Amino acid sequence: MTLPIHQYPALLAKKAENLTALLAPFNAPELDVFASDTSHFRLRAEFRVWHDNGDLYHIMFDQATKQRYRVDQFPIASQLINRMMTVLLAEIKGNELLTRKLFQIDYLSTLSGQIAVSMLYHKSLTEEWIEQAKLLKQRLIGYGFDVQLIGRATKQKIALDCDYVEEALNVDGQIYRYRQVENSFTQPNGKMNIKMLEWARACTANSKGDLLELYCGNGNFSIALANQFRKVLATEISKSSVESAQYNIAVNGVDNLQIIRMSAEEFTEAMNGVRVFYRLRGIDLKQYDCNTIFVDPPRVGLDQATLEMVQGYEKILYISCNPHTLADNLKQLTQTHRIERCALFDQFPYTEHIESGVWLIRNNQVGEK
């Protein structure tokens, strides 16, 4: 697999042109465009495993033809993943316990040098498998890997030591530490994530009052933004993400951030007094003066009720993984707010995917940060 690196500037320019056109009806200012590294930028990857007369190798499927193809090196993935791909298969080849009915391998790496390898099977994992996996892990450590090894099968998950890696990001000269659990969402392009965090901090610099974040995940944004605000209230529905967020809050010494496990839609109902939630016991929403809201919704964008709630805030920071639903949401948001800043973050080079951000301020807040 080779990358069209020489085409990257033109591909990025085309994305910027497309996003600029989508934002044009809303009087958006000039885009801040953040380019990615042109190779080895992706920190996670997953592959099917193909067994062929005693040999085995990683495969992927062509999106157009659906035909499988062999993958020995994967230049969009981190150097760490590429090195592990080669060493891992060499170490398990010929080991019946570790290779039999192995159908997929997932890799999660970090900028900090740690990597988690998840091996997925169409069989139950036995004590014998665990013993062989422990020996495999020791051999991988012998190669210099800081590795966690996880086995998964139907209704089974075995982490030899733990099921997470620890990331460290240098954001505006400060190190933020994040626990990232395998098979949970993490930002795939680590260096671009840093650029997104720094852009979000630049937008919210000198903010007054409190911040509300919907869809906070493992606290990626809310932790980095916490010292910009008096207090931060954040929501997330995934149990594993909430647990990671709580750990990340503690390890970063953040004392003004509260995470609530509920969906954005449920929180909207709570704010509007539609329902009373047991999960909100002990949390007095009236103690928060949230004049800024941060949203990073799924591809479908914000639902109508949440969109209306978001309009009630003076300042809106909206990170989008789908510029078309962003544009659709902006039709309503720009009735009350104006776009002060907008950005393109090239999380996924060589694809049509566009990650973007907009910073909106209520129309009567002229000249205010």
From Swiss-Prot:
| EC top class named in words | transferase
| Keywords assigned | Methyltransferase, S-adenosyl-L-methionine, Transferase, tRNA processing
Under catalytic activity, the entry for this protein gives:
uridine(54) in tRNA + S-adenosyl-L-methionine = 5-methyluridine(54) in tRNA + S-adenosyl-L-homocysteine + H(+); uridine(341) in tmRNA + S-adenosyl-L-methionine = 5-methyluridine(341) in tmRNA + S-adenosyl-L-homocysteine + H(+)
Q: GO molecular function of the protein, one example?
A: rRNA binding
Q: Where does S-adenosyl-L-methionine bind?
A: 187, 215, 220, 236, 296
Active site, renumbered: 321 (nucleophile), 355 (proton acceptor)
What is known about what this protein does? Dual-specificity methyltransferase that catalyzes the formation of 5-methyluridine at position 54 (m5U54) in all tRNAs, and that of position 341 (m5U341) in tmRNA (transfer-mRNA).
- Which PANTHER family does the entry link to? TRNA/TMRNA (URACIL-C(5))-METHYLTRANSFERASE, TRNA_TMRNA (URACIL-C(5))-METHYLTRANSFERASE
For this chain, the family text in UniProt reads: Belongs to the class I-like SAM-binding methyltransferase superfamily. RNA M5U methyltransferase family. TrmA subfamily.
Q: What is this protein called?
A: tRNA/tmRNA (uracil-C(5))-methyltransferase
